[in-house]
Amino acid sequence: MPRPGRATAKILALIACLQCFVVSGSLAAGADQAPEADWPTRAWPVSSPEQHGMKSGVLARLVETVGGYKQNSLLIVRHGKIVLDAYYAPYLPNITHDVRSVTKSVLSTLTAIAIRNGQLDGVEHPVVDMFSDKQIPDIDDNKKAITVQQLLDMTSGIAWQEKSFTPDEAIVRMYQVPDRTAFVLSQPMSDAPGAKFYYNSGNPYVLSALINRKTGQNAFEFAKKELFGPLGITSAGWGRADSQGVIDGGAGLSLAPHDMARIGYLYLRNGIWEGKQIIPSSWVDRAREGKTPATFGFHYANLWWSLPEMDAFMAQGRHSQLILVLPKLDIVAVMTGILRDDQFYPMRRLVDDIASAVKSDGPLPPDAVGASLLEASVREAATERPSSVGITPELVKQISGKAYQFSANALKVKTFALNLIDPDPFWEITTETENADRPTRRFSGILGLHGIFRMSPPANYGINASKGRWLDERTFALERRILGHSETQLWVLAFDGNKVEVSFEDTDGSKAKLYGEKKD
């Protein structure tokens, strides 16, 4: 499946972490015949799985299985109540999480609201007509024919590269120009509009620009008033607007897992919230049915993925961010994670694993043994297991507290220092900036040396968690995360006298080599 999000070389590392706990939900017949909902606008009600026809013992096994896939959280709602709420160490509850391309599905929801409000006149309107002030070369009949619906279905026909996130790809070049909307619409056409599915994060960027143009607000401002406010979503953050005032519609949104579940619950309840039709039920139906055949056996529509044969549809983001809606089971499931692109939990298996816990639409008898197993699984997930640390060499005395200065590099790292002897070991990096008033920027974090992540006090970029270990007598590995970000970062430092070679890698696929020398 195409990888949502972007992978630019980063200096921050990314993280996710700790703690788990369990709960459960109420009772009903399936979303299509659900009784009056117990709306979770202020807080999610919780209950035991058995009260809502699910087996705690099966969910306990699911918590353990999902934990093997480097997830940060797993949440399941049935009949409007949380029946499972687990967090994997070192991730913590209530931390806002980068949801990557789940952003697209939220942007779709905002498009539906703009149509409901009469601010956008419908999905069949030609897109280029609404940007007549843009300088768009080579406008042919195919480009003139692109509609809002085709942007929503990833069938715009615009030629696009979005796979490896290398500098030559359109997705990377888009972020380097001042007018990204014009950039997307200026790309050549590879197919007639509507003819073929092709994943293109430029499509939702143009939709976000339409939100600006038609509502007078950027997507985040519009969402706070029209979507997040009514649903009780309070955790949201959403990147920065570009020079045109447009928020990225393809990525950049952050939500806590409970707020992700609210988005899914809106769709489970056919667009209704507290008796008000927030989005048309037909919009939900189209996402659920998946009108457009996509990749890997999935379907796609309205910026949502679907498996129609399983009656499952989902918002998905890179590194395993997920809002899964199972209408016939009256279930919403949420996952956040830090997985590499080749490590996704198989979606069909996940649907089957969740469904296997459902035994009835009504309550089951209490199950003390199952409840105990589930409680233990959630507690175990929240407890970090120490990793190996290696033997501390004599070299530590020579490098600890010393700063190493680096030649020009892709990460713009100027200096790197490790303090491994202090009672509170820490690392420190300085990087170059393009700001003449502030030419360097400093990052630092407390470092766990006993196989456990240690958390630094919250910074403006989040909560840093780091741990390090010796691979051999001259090689030290530092793993760094920022809780709630969907990437992890690994720095491997190989020391040789006064010199150091640093190998950098993150889960976005960025890699770099840095060469430094000890400062006098």
Where are these regions (language model features)?
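Bacterial N-terminal signal peptides
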Residues: 11-24
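Peripheral terminal and inter-domain segments
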Residues: 366-520
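Active-site Gly/Thr loop motif
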Residues: 235-237, 281-335
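Catalytic-site signature segments of enzymes, centered on catalytic residues
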Residues: 93-94, 163-252
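A short, well-structured edge-of-sheet supersecondary motif
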Residues: 61-92, 123, 330-333
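Active-site helix/loop module of the DD-peptidase/beta-lactamase fold
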Residues: 98, 117-158, 186, 215-251, ...
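Active-site-proximal alpha-helical segments within enzyme catalytic domains
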Residues: 203-210, 249-272, 321-338, 350
